């Protein structure tokens, strides 16, 4: 499996909540360099916990890879997530409010020679997310 296909497969696995496939794609020593990752368990268990939480908050969550490219051991993806806040965001103190979201994030992943993802750096457009959820005034 090449690096581009690994990212596509990972997004499908998260969407399907297929955490066995997530374990196949993320290395055992996986490290997430993302805001809030310190609140999660380390490694791929933390990545799976974050995804599970997003499905609780947004049970109708859909993600689309808008852009994806790679060179060497790195891939860069631009992902768009849509959904409806049915479960709230406990980490932000936001209750369920049925507001729709449409938010982007950028992710850089480092792939190992074993074909697995070993590190990810990701940044979501959190200000837009907070505005869409009514937790921050619009600009």
Spans of model-derived segments:
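C-terminal and inter-domain tail/linker signature
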Residues: 1-139
């Amino acid at each position: 499996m090449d690096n581009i296909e690994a990212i596509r497969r990972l997004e499908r696995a998260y969407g399907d909540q297929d955490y066995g496939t997530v374990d196949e794609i993320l290395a055992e020593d996986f490290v997430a360099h993302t805001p809030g990752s310190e609140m999660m368990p380390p490694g791929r268990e933390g990545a799976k916990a974050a995804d599970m939480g997003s499905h609780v908050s947004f049970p109708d969550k859909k993600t689309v890879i808008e852009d994806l490219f790679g060179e060497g051991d790195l891939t860069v993806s631009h992902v768009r997530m849509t959904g409806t806040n049915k479960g709230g965001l406990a980490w932000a103190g936001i209750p369920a409010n049925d507001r729709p979201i449409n938010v982007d994030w950028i992710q850089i992943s480092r792939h190992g020679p074993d074909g697995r993802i070993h590190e990810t750096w990701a940044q979501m457009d959190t200000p837009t997310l907070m505005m869409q959820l009514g937790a921050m005034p619009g600009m």
